[in-house]
């Protein structure tokens, strides 16, 4: 066949053997997996395996034999036929054989088709559980992390010892794959992310481009601005759930650079992202840069800058709401701080009808900073820190203390954040 070149000619040479193998198993159309679930097929599986074994023994010395059985292994991986795959492997199928088009191995294909039993079989036969494909540099764990439907394969790979923190040439780990593949509307990889974190995924993983575990969340929060209201609610709920998981496993939302800091982003738009910001502060997130302090960026400066940039008028409900939420955020900062860290040159120049209230807020913070914190405040902060992680207020209410002490331990503006989300 001189008109066929390269891998096309090779495929042409071994395709008859592949067809014969599929035919021996009663598979006419490999794309129709549902036909393999018929009771009649299951009942006759033993006889089909015998036919397959006889075929392989008869064709063992034919040209392109290994290529043919190895290609057939890809089909078995796709369909989840573990017994047939085991026979092919015992008769010379190559675990490292790549699909001529996608360059995926049988293990990659088994993951893509969510065949956890096939994954286990291939690994037990010696397949490299951390092998990356040549095109996308994806490991089986990367592929399993990208779709919620592949959760069974993700669990099986972790149980079999896949390296949860292996990264591709760009520095992207399975956790970052799971986050980047989530859109908060149609794809919710929350359980995938939970499994990876429980399996030891590093929350400090960073790509060569500087993407962190919070990059996806920050991007999705930006998508809620001016978008469909129902979709925005779904995205906010997803971001809250994932942020809660990340913080529970030690992620720091207040690290610089500012554009990669979830706390900084929520502070900049505290009216829009108020429930999530309240959760971050209740969970003990720093309101200044956690690496360099207020000299890098300060939550107090951001809040007052936003207030002063919105003059408003007395009957302006949006500005009144903005001021109310600013008071809540400031109260949470004070409630969770042993000593306030106000930025240097922290001067403001508010204008408009609410300028006096803004100035009064600023003055009260200056007063708090200028005096040593009282013992009762230090005790309040220490107890709240001890009761973390969130929800602190639920734990405070369960303490065997008089109601008056509970009231003092509670933040003045506490509420049900999950309901708000």
Curated annotation (Swiss-Prot):
Give the protein's recorded name. Ankyrin repeat and SOCS box protein 6
What is the role of this chain?
Probable substrate-recognition component of a SCF-like ECS (Elongin-Cullin-SOCS-box protein) E3 ubiquitin-protein ligase complex which mediates the ubiquitination and subsequent proteasomal degradation of target proteins. May play a role in the regulation of cell proliferation and autophagy by promoting the ubiquitination and degradation of SQSTM1.
Record bears the keyword Nucleotide-binding: no
Q: How does it assemble?
A: Binds APS. Identified in a complex with ELOB and ELOC. Interacts with CUL5 and RNF7. Interacts with SQSTM1.
Signal peptide positions on this chain:
none
One biological process GO term for this chain? protein ubiquitination
CDD domains with a match to the protein in the record: SOCS_ASB6
């Amino acid at each position: 066949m001189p008109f066929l070149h390269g891998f096309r000619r090779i495929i042409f040479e071994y395709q008859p053997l592949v067809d014969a193998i599929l035919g021996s198993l009663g598979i006419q159309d490999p794309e129709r997996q549902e036909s393999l679930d018929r009771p009649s097929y299951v009942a006759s599986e033993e006889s089909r395996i015998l036919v397959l074994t006889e075929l392989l023994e008869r064709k063992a010395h034919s040209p392109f034999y290994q290529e043919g059985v190895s290609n057939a292994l890809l089909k078995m991986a796709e369909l989840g036929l573990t017994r047939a795959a085991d026979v092919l492997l015992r008769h010379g199928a190559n675990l490292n054989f790549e699909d001529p088009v996608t360059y995926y191995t049988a293990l990659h294909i088994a993951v893509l088709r969510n065949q956890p039993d096939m994954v286990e079989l291939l690994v037990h036969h010696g397949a490299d559980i951390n092998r990356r494909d040549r095109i996308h540099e994806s490991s089986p764990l990367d592929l399993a992390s990208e779709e919620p439907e592949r959760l069974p394969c993700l669990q099986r790979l972790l149980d079999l010892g896949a390296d949860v923190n292996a990264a591709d040439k760009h520095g992207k780990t399975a956790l970052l794959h799971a986050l980047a593949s989530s859109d908060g509307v149609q794809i919710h990889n929350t359980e995938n992310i939970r499994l990876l974190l429980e399996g030891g995924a590093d929350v400090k993983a960073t790509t060569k481009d500087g993407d962190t575990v919070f990059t996806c969340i920050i991007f999705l929060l930006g998508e809620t601005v001016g978008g469909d209201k129902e979709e925005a609610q779904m995205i906010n709920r997803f971001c809250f759930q994932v942020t809660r998981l990340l913080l529970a496993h030690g992620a720091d939302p207040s690290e610089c650079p500012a554009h990669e800091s979830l706390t900084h982003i929520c502070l900049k738009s505290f009216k829009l992202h108020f429930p999530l910001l309240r959760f971050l502060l209740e969970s003990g997130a720093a309101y200044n840069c956690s690496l360099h302090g207020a000299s890098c960026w300060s939550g107090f400066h951001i809040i007052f800058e936003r207030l002063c940039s919105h003059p408003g008028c007395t009957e302006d409900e949006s500005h009144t709401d903005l001021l109310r939420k600013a008071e809540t955020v400031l109260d949470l900062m004070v409630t969770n701080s042993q000593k306030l860290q106000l930025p240097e040159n922290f001067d403001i120049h508010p204008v408009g009808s609410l300028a006096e209230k803004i100035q009064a807020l600023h003055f009260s913070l200056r007063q708090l900073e200028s005096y040593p914190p009282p013992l009762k405040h230090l005790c309040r902060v220490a107890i709240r820190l001890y009761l973390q992680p969130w929800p602190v207020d639920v734990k405070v209410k369960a303490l065997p203390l008089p109601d008056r002490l509970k009231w003092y331990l509670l933040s003045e503006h506490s509420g049900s954040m999950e309901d708000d989300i």
